[in-house]
Amino acid sequence: MILKHPQFQAYSSIHIAGIEGKPFDIEIQNGRFTSVKEAEPRHVQAEQPQQKLWISPGIIDLHTHLAWTDFDHADQLNRDSREVEVMQAEAFAATLRTGVTTARDAGGILPSTIRHLVKYYQQPLRVQTSSEMLGAADAKGVKHLEGRLAEIYATGAGWIKIMATGGLGAPTEKVTEPNFSEEEFAFIVRHAHANRKKVLVHTWGGVTIDWSIQAGVESIEHGMFLTWDQAGRLAESGVAFVPTTSIYRIAADPKGVLALSPVICERAARAADAHATAIGYAKRAGIRLGFGTDYATPSLHGYNLQEFDTLLDYGLNRAEAWKSATQDAAEILGSGHELGRIAEGYVADAVIYAADPYQAQNADQLRKSIISVVTGADEAGLI
């Protein structure tokens, strides 16, 4: 159940995820938390037992692709526009149902499309977007890049996405080679920041991580070939790291939902193996980590919580993993003053559970424990 922009909602003796042994009385008015206080002891009659509930902030997915309907974009081009629109609306609905109340789309969807989907399909998912991505085809000098950036700004996007290296489509031995010159890369970041846009950088590793640190981008994505030296400098710079770990483990499975070719599966497996080391470096160095899935197909939307499983497998504790999906994710978006916490004055984006989410054994158990999702905004507040 999605509870949209509640005018008034009260929860008595509810437990906040991550705070043990202290139930809280929580009130929401006009879509914001107005009271969060430790509950006074109550006498509950034996014949009227109270259901024990937990609440967490709404989950923030910092790297998703809500407009994409197929792993191979050529397949999406074969679909008619009405079919694509319905599938995009279903992606919004599935994402909300799994407890994700805010998403940063990492390329592919326009702000105008978001407004349309929110309004006509009644799905109050808060989305920040980067519209179109800048990739190898745009490495034609700063004059060309200036024009491309102007086009992206005109869409209303708040983020600029730089495809700084290859990905699963590139041979492993070449995947960290830069798509842009250092001059072009620095120009993009400088121009974006001058126009009050934030920058996220797709990079598997290599020199483009160094460039990202030097330029002061907001976040790097994937980063599985991050070195220990780079991790230290990344932490010092304040640049965030959104590793998107689960998608590579999914892609590596030849019998999985993506059913990719053996060559792609092998590349994904190498990436997944490297990610465990990169997460270890990031944790030791104190890098701000952000939760992101890189999910882009109907078989994956709605299963965003799988990212918790891989983050835990790769060495984060539960508090660190949850912080990456709430408080730290909100800070990365520039919304740490109003999202990512159960606190008075904050937007009431939240998830209600029938069991302690910190004790869930896996993403499937966590997802099944969700009773309702609360969105502080309704559709009108997001368009």
For every predicted segment, state its role.
Residues I16, A325-Q327, E331, E344-I383:
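C-terminal cap of metal-dependent C-N hydrolases
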Residues M1-H43, L53-I55, V351, P357-A360:
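N-terminal metal-binding scaffold of metallo-dependent hydrolase/deaminase domains
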Residues H144-A164, G169-F241, V257-L258, A268-L289, ...:
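Histidine/acidic residue-rich metal-binding segments in metalloenzymes
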Residues D70-H73, R115, I209-A215, I247-L260, ...:
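Histidine/acidic-residue-rich catalytic or RNA/ligand-binding cores of hydrolases
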Residues H65-L96, P124, Q128-S131, G166-E182, ...:
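Active-site gating loops and adjacent loop-to-helix segments of metal-dependent hydrolytic enzymes
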